């Protein structure tokens, strides 16, 4: 069930990014990243997660793989989390705190909206 929810979230995010003018490639399976998106000016390397919980733990090595790939690709690393019944939230890995083994993201963690991520934010949602 988790795989299906995650794949569904990936497809939903693909449609959202395409509606904002991005070309998007989805990498199905357990690879380094889930989505690569670009619009000719900006390139995003995205790890997608979906959870019914109010918090999420990501292994440090998964985030490091994302950052490493994005660096080699010339893109910006992004963690996209869909909190079910809350919505999408976007995080830059360098702005997250982590413990010895994992990063923790919860509903209190400062985040960006999709428009904020793309530099088109018009409200303070997620900023404060």
Swiss-Prot record:
GO molecular function, one term: DNA binding
InterPro entries: Hjc, Hjc_arc, Restrct_endonuc-II-like, tRNA_endonuc-like_dom_sf
Highest taxon in the source lineage: Archaea
Positions of Mg(2+) binding: 10, 34, 47
Cofactor details (free text): Binds 1 Mg(2+) ion per subunit.
Cross-referenced SUPFAM superfamilies: Restriction endonuclease-like
UniProt-annotated site: Transition state stabilizer, residues: 49
EC number(s) stated in the UniProt entry for this protein: 3.1.21.10
Keyword Metal-binding (UniProt): yes
Active site: 30
The entry's keywords: DNA damage, DNA recombination, DNA repair, DNA-binding, Endonuclease, Hydrolase, Magnesium, Metal-binding, Nuclease
Cofactors required: Mg(2+)
Family named by the database record: Belongs to the Holliday junction resolvase Hjc family.
Subunit structure of this chain's protein: Homodimer.
Function: A structure-specific endonuclease that resolves Holliday junction (HJ) intermediates during genetic recombination. Cleaves 4-way DNA junctions introducing paired nicks in opposing strands, leaving a 5'-terminal phosphate and a 3'-terminal hydroxyl group that are subsequently ligated to produce recombinant products.
NCBIfam families xrefs: Hol_resolv_Hjc
Protein name (Swiss-Prot/TrEMBL): Crossover junction endodeoxyribonuclease Hjc
Gene that produces this protein: hjc
């Amino acid at each position: 069930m988790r795989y299906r929810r995650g794949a569904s979230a990936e497809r939903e995010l693909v449609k959202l990014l395409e509606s904002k003018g991005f070309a998007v490639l989805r990498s199905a399976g357990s690879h380094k990243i889930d989505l690569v998106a670009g619009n000719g000016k900006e390139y995003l390397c995205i790890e997608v997660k979906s959870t019914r919980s109010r918090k999420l733990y990501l292994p440090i090595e998964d985030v490091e793989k994302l950052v490493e790939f994005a660096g080699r690709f010339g893109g910006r690393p992004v963690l996209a989390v869909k909190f079910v019944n809350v919505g999408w939230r976007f995080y830059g890995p360098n702005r997250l705190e982590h413990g010895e083994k994992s990063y923790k993201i919860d509903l209190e963690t400062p985040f960006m909206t999709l428009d904020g991520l793309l530099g088109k934010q018009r409200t303070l949602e997620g900023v404060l």
